[in-house]
């Protein structure tokens, strides 16, 4: 009875027993009753709750006192969709898409809802978004046809969401038609920046929680982000079809209240797999998501009707014009748009003013959210920070592909196409604005608050397969950075690998996804060096008040070169794991990954929370992979902002045939230098091709050799033709051979050729 009363939109319902006529609550019967089935309609929303046991299909409802007991039977709870009624509170709009798009400007802000879907990894965001799109008629076909919002090839191959995707939906509710912009976001911690950008276009978030897994690390991260931005939060429990008993649901509800302070009465229960609870969720979005606000009006003289200059009507309309203000959320080119691209050679539709767009390689499509004013084709748009001016060639919404419309007004999220642009002008977070008349100036325009600058967590060198292709690689990286602005780029030179780029990422998975997108979208095969973290140092002359400076293998300075101390990034890592794996993970974290345990807490009967202070380098080196593999994917790992602490660091240089290989240099703690150097030279020894002379391999810390191996030379049997005689004849041949090899070695100092396969194997050894 206690749990039933607290379920959102289910009500306080009792069933009449068919045997004795008493009243009883069917939900609280997980311990014994073998109810054939029960169904009860929510008096407020029309949802029907269904419970079935053991596959029985009877229709009689009896109280627990008239049913046999069975401790081995567990109830399965689902929320079924409402039966169709004439007075349904809302229904999907049946008009054609063209009519709705043509009338898009007639939607007042009060009839617009912008909502983002956020959750931990694998809590059902993409699947639920796909079901909502199909329920509102945007997509056709079964849900099993594939997740629509995962457009990129790498997303479909890996089964994870990498890019946020937006889609506009139309639905009727209470006699009014609403425009709903749904934003599906990634769940992995490496793409947190993508989430923070996407929610800027929303007034609320759907905070999804897998009812079986409960509150996870990223759930709390998204919750605090929504609070910081002042967004409304609608908690949604997913995968209700997997619930075996009410204890699981009750525990998840209690955890939600304790962790977030959200009331369990606010929770919406859904099952995307069974398409249940979808109508209740849509109703909650309409009723509980705030509508956007902003100044309404035309924003450019091109939007005015053809009136004589100076006429009374024109003067009156110009007086009512308001400057456009919009924020740039994302941008992409033809190659990296995931299919969201309209060839600019085609003529825009009548809705966009029949603007002829010329084919141009510098065409950019931007996703924008309109704060004030109106955005149409031919609008002269100014970029606030770059101070450049461009003309909008086409505007529209994503429904589910790029659909041109007459305009984008206050509260709408849509796209705008620009041609002949400088791609570096369109930075994410840029404010787009207009000055419709002379009374408006740039000083009077308040820029939309941009996004916080993100700092890379790991760095890696990207080198093309062939050195002469570095220009193509740089072009591909710049195009992809428009769609993934969290990546930083610096030029890089290596004696062994040639010219390349040093890229900064938010995590190892982020790096892997970027590499795969370079191959799938641009055909760029690259050699990637092992990821390294950003170290820092403090100058001795500057004192403790001077901020530390970045340090890498390329900018390394020793203590005698004016360095006061080195600093290493540390994080607080939080692991939520099934209890059976907690002991193994805890032991490995402290033994092999320099983790210092801060907390160990039992969350419930099945899960344990572990918290460590750990160097970021050790987490990158393999702790995340170890946790996932050891727990078979059931554990989650989250870490907070970086904190730099003093550390005893050294640079390990690898010398092959007296030549330093900069691509294999690595920074590590002093006590780990011998083992790191030994792994690298051992890998080189096993992969290098033998030659006619010995190849010495050394690992150096400064001038001190901490590890050494030798690739032995092939030896020709120079005494093969000497079958008799004194031993001195053979010794003379051996001495001549030794002197000849010494002369060859002097001529080939630093001349050993290292194939990329050899370097890749050695680089992999640095990450072990």
UniProtKB/Swiss-Prot annotation:
Is this entry keyworded Coiled coil? no
What is the uppermost EC class here?
A: hydrolase
Report the subcellular localization: Mitochondrion inner membrane
Q: Name one GO cellular component term.
A: mitochondrial matrix
Enzyme Commission numbers on file: 3.6.5.-
Which PROSITE patterns would you find in this protein's record? G_TR_1, G_TR_2
Keyword annotations for this protein?
GTP-binding, Hydrolase, Membrane, Mitochondrion, Mitochondrion inner membrane, Nucleotide-binding, Protein biosynthesis, Transit peptide
Lipid bilayer topology: Peripheral membrane protein
Positions with a binding annotation for GTP: 119-126, 184-188, 238-241
- Please report the stretch or stretches of sequence annotated as the tr-type G domain: 110-293
Catalyses: GTP + H2O = GDP + phosphate + H(+)
Q: Which GO terms describe its molecular function?
A: GTP binding; GTPase activity; mitochondrial ribosome binding
Q: What does this protein do?
A: Promotes mitochondrial protein synthesis. May act as a fidelity factor of the translation reaction, by catalyzing a one-codon backward translocation of tRNAs on improperly translocated ribosomes. Binds to mitochondrial ribosomes in a GTP-dependent manner.
Question: What's the protein name?
Answer: Translation factor GUF1 homolog, mitochondrial
Q: Which organism is it from?
A: Trypanosoma brucei brucei (strain 927/4 GUTat10.1)
